[in-house]
Structure formats: C-alpha cells, structure tokens
Amino acid sequence: MKILIINTGSSSLKFAIYQYENSKKIISGIVEKIKSQKSIIKIVNTDGSTTERFEKGIENHQKAIEKMFKILTNSDLKILKTLSEIKIIGHRVVHGGSSLKNSVILNNSILNKLKQISELAPLHNPNAITAIEAVLKILPHAKQVLCFDTSWHQTIKEHAFLYAIPYSWYKNHNIRKYGFHGLSYSYITKRSSEILNKKIDSLNLIILHLGNGASINAVKNGKSYDTSMGITPLEGLAMGTRSGDIDPSIINLMSTILNKTTKQIEEILNKESGILGISEKSNDMRDIWNKIEEGEYQSKLAVEIMTYRIKKYIGSYIAALDFNVDAIVFTGGIGVTDYGIRALALKGFEKIGIELDLEKNEMAQSKYLESEISTINSKLKILAIPTNEESTILEDIYNLIPKNL
C-alpha cells in the first residue's frame, strides 16, 4: 500500500511515493516547465541516481498528473504494478483561507471551499485544484489529504495578522495576513529543536525560506509569531518574480499610466517583478550572479534590494521576539545553497554579536546537507537546513488516517 505526495507549483509538479506501513520513500520526481514548449521530467531513485527526459510541452497540470501516473506504472521503471496500490494522496496546498485552518480529508464540500478562495493564491491554488480533480478522475476511491501552508500560521495573534484598515473588512470579509511556507516552517522548527537540543515550546527562531518565492517567519516558543507574506504570497520580501512590499497606491497609479486593469497590474507584480523585474534578465539566481560577474548593474541592484529587504525583516523580527532568539535558520533552494545571499543579508549583524563564519558559509552550498555557519563566539546560532515539506505532509496524513487503516 502506497502514499503519493504531490506538491503543485506554478509551473511544476513534484511527486513522491512512500510505503504506507513504514514511511519509506520509494521514489520521487518532478515535472518542470509545465505550459512551456518543452517540459522536463526528472525521476530521483532512493540511491540518488536520476533519470531525465524531455517531453513535448505538457500544457497544464492535469496533463502533468496523467503523465506522472504513466511514469509510475511504466513496466521498465518497476515503481508500481498498478495505480490501485496508491491508497492515499497528500497534497501541499498553498492557501486554506479562513475556512480551511488544518489539514483535511477531501470531500465535495472541502473542494468547493477551496475553489472559492483560489484567487488568494493565484499562482498556486488553481493548479492544485486541477491536480486534485485529475487525481479524483483517475483514483476516485483513494483518500486525498489536503495540507495547507497557511495552517502553521494560525497561532499568529490579531495584533500581528490584522492590517490597519477598517475592522469591518476583517469581520465581514476575512481580510488579514495568512502567511505561507507553513509546511516548511513546521519541519524546520522541529529539526532546529533537535539540532539545538532545545524543547520546541521554549524555542525562538527566525527562519528564512528563500526560493523563487521567499518569506521569513518569527517563531516564538515553537509557534508562528509573525511572518512576512500576507493575505496572498505577494507581500513581504522581494522574490524571484514578486514585488513583495509596495505602496498599494502604485496599483491604481500604474493602472492609469499604463492603461491596464488593476488585475493586470497585480499580474505584473506577481509574475514580472522582484528579481526579474529589477534585473530585466532573469529570476534565476545563478543567472543573476553570472551577470553580476560580468559587471551588469541592474542584476547587482536586484540582489541589493533583495538582501536589504531580508536584513530589515531580520532586524524587525529580532525586536518582535524581544531580542531573545536562539537561531537564524536559512532554508529553501536559495537559502541553503546561495552563500552570497546569506552573507549580504547578515552583513553588519556582527556589530550586535550575530557572527557569520564566512568560510563555513561559503562551504555550505549543498541542497541536501545541514550546516552550522555561525562563528564559535556568535550570540546565536546560524544554520542552513534543507526543508522537507513531505515530512510534514506525511505526519499530517498519519494523524488523519492512522497506520492501522
């Protein structure tokens, strides 16, 4: 009996198969560049070996699900004999809104609620819904568990999650900060507790999940206390293609100047801003660093804007946690591999005793290895820990569907 875990991105679909009885991972993979002319499918075996193939453009996430199931039952790969071996599917869903606060087993009512809030995470939730419905068609009798990134942040207090807008907007329309990357933050908090040998309920952290989407989380006594993303994943840090914090008046101003609808401006803020918007080159940090080496000004400026924003948030969260912080933890694809971003984000903090070991930092470039990158004399630990959202999803699945099923 198998568990399939699906993580639906804006243009990707990650998947993994686990043995139900012992939580052992059997295989994982990713379909990349969905909606592009040429898509890529990668399979990662348990021994670390990979196979990669190019496919004629996979046009949407439904087709990606169908392709994934064909791969999983491919007789040459010997992953599954039949799809009926899969009894449970766990989905990462970015936004649960105000009505879906905890992980749930899918039913028609839950699916309808999810559709009603899809506009709150326009890059992710609609694709997750497509994937869920595609699985329903192919495996109608399997249980599907939805795990929300917003669930982790339910412990944030009103003074931190409310915007200074008419209170009726919150009471009548649930306009508030929700926060994201919660599955990642939940895992990192537990793992940091183990590494630091400190009980979770007394653990204070500042966690930075830095990838194409990026956010920061203040953790107080092992629970989410504040976070940079808002009602949607657009707020906060400058990201790969998202603007992060801006003056909201810009939306109407540019709508008038460019003769575009506010919806079109919002689309630009989500898909054409951030690192891509400033550099006008790429949202891939590898490309950006190459351009910086070539002396390209806008790419350098994009990194300066990104790391300055990170530095401001770290400083504000140190204050929000009453200057009682056990560790600063970097995670996400950029967070664990990009030593340059970490160094720039923490530059100057040595003046208050938060010391990055530059040599250790430069050595920490692996997607898979945990690293302590602070100096011996640093007042708090600085860690780089690869995230494991699948671990959080598995834990939630077993809480909802016991192993003696």
From Swiss-Prot:
Keyword hit for ATP-binding: yes
Cofactor(s) listed: Mg(2+); Mn(2+)
Gene3D superfamilies assigned: 3.30.420.40
Localisation per UniProt entry: Cytoplasm
Enzyme Commission number, as recorded: 2.7.2.1
One of the record's GO cellular component terms: cytoplasm
GO molecular function terms noted in the UniProt entry: acetate kinase activity; ATP binding; magnesium ion binding
Binding site for ATP: 14, 209-213, 284-286
Keywords from the named record: ATP-binding, Cytoplasm, Kinase, Magnesium, Metal-binding, Nucleotide-binding, Transferase
Entry's cofactor comment: Mg(2+). Can also accept Mn(2+).
Active site as annotated: 149
Catalytic activity: acetate + ATP = acetyl phosphate + ADP
Subunit structure: Homodimer.
Protein name as catalogued: Acetate kinase
